């Protein structure tokens, strides 16, 4: 039930809505971040010690988040209280309990790097060069290339049409491999210019 699930998201002893670091030797885990609605892609940037995360919002409000590691407290990205999206019509959800604040920061949450309204249905995210990244999109049937500046803000955001749902992406040796859903095929793009 929606209300039970969303209540679990806010509890620190629940794993709902959390990004976890799992010890593969003993299955112990540590909560890296919380307040996530529907994570789709994760990329650990070892060089810069952060995680990029793509996330589906409700009706709109898809996000790319930057999760700083080794913080003193667990960062909260706001769900189910903050989102650039809107509620779906539902008799189960009590909207007054879940207002979907448009500003995350004003309510004590971490702002996304970017929110997409209307929804683009982001998929995987990966790094393709020194500080260039790319995220796939299922609804928008495209790729989003972007850089992060010294303040870790998105710059040079560029949309490249693919005309198919991009389910997953992998970067290897100046090539971006796209796992395309509409035709169950693999697309390859030379990204050596980045």
Stretches found by the model and what they are:
Residues 1-155:
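Beta-propeller domain segments
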Residues 23, 158-160, 190:
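Ser/Thr- (and often Asn-) enriched beta-sheet segments in non-cytosolic proteins
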Residues 67, 93-95, 149, 159, ...:
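Generic preference for flexible, low-structure residues
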Residues 123, 152-173:
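Conserved blade-ending motifs and adjacent loop-strand segments that build the rim/top face
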Residues 168-194:
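Blade-level signature of beta-propeller repeat domains, shared across WD40, Kelch, NHL, RCC1
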């Amino acid at each position: 039930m929606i209300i039970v699930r969303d209540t679990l998201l806010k509890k620190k002893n629940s794993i709902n809505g959390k990004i976890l670091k799992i010890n593969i030797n003993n299955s112990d885990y540590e909560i890296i971040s919380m307040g996530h609605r529907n994570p789709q892609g994760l990329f650990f940037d070892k060089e810069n010690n952060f995680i990029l995360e793509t996330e589906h919002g409700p009706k709109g409000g898809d996000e790319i988040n930057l999760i700083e590691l080794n913080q003193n407290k667990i960062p909260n990205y706001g769900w189910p209280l903050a989102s650039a999206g809107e509620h779906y019509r539902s008799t189960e959800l009590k909207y007054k309990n879940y207002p979907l604040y448009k500003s995350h920061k004003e309510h004590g949450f971490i702002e996304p790097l970017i929110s997409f309204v209307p929804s683009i249905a982001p998929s995987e995210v990966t790094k393709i060069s020194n500080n260039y990244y790319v995220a796939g999109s299922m609804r928008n049937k495209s790729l989003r290339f972007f850089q992060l500046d010294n303040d870790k803000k998105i710059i040079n955001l560029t949309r490249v049409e693919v005309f198919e749902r991009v389910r997953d992406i992998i970067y290897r040796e100046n090539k971006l491999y796209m796992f395309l859903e509409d035709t169950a095929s693999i697309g390859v793009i030379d990204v050596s210019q980045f």
